[in-house]
Amino acid sequence: MPAAADVHPYNHALIVAAVLSAIGALLHVACIAGGPAWYRFFGAGERMATAAERGEWWPAIATLGITLVLLAWAAYALSAAGMLPVLPLLKAGIVAITAVYLLRGLILFPVLALKPSQVTPFIVWSSLICLGYGLVHLWGVVQVWDTL
């Protein structure tokens, strides 16, 4: 009888990381569907919300671009977790994705120290979310490093 660890060979931290990126992607789609009010609520900025109100196409295109990036990042996390076939440049890709999330999250602290007047609630919560995403990725990457 196989040991409990042998039953599920997938890396759970990277599966969670993939789900987090997919949730981010879905929230970006919700912003497109929800329109200007959703752009404002999620902190996309008044310029983006106003452009969406005017019916301009670029807010949806930019948001769709972010959605596609987040879905690709979810796929890379699933690949590194062992749930999808090995994607091109998997090790470099998952390390870069992890670094982007961590750096995006950590940027909060120098901004708090150097320009606290520019820190908005959006910057705080989005930075903390990205830092959390990055830490989950890092946890998983460390666990699978030798197999990448």
Where are these regions (language model features)?
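Hydrophobic alpha-helical membrane segments
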Residues: G93-F109
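N-terminal signal-anchor transmembrane alpha helix
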Residues: L14-A33
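Membrane-helix boundary connector in multi-pass membrane proteins
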Residues: I107-F122, G140-W145
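Interfacial loop at the N-terminal end of multi-pass membrane proteins
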Residues: P2-V7, L27-A62, A80-M83
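Membrane-water interface at the C-terminal end of transmembrane alpha helices
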Residues: G132-L148
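Core segments of transmembrane alpha-helices
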Residues: A60-A77, I129-L131
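Non-cytosolic membrane-interface motifs at loop->transmembrane helix junctions
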Residues: N11, P85-K91, P116-S126
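Cytoplasmic juxtamembrane regions at transmembrane-helix boundaries
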Residues: L78-I97
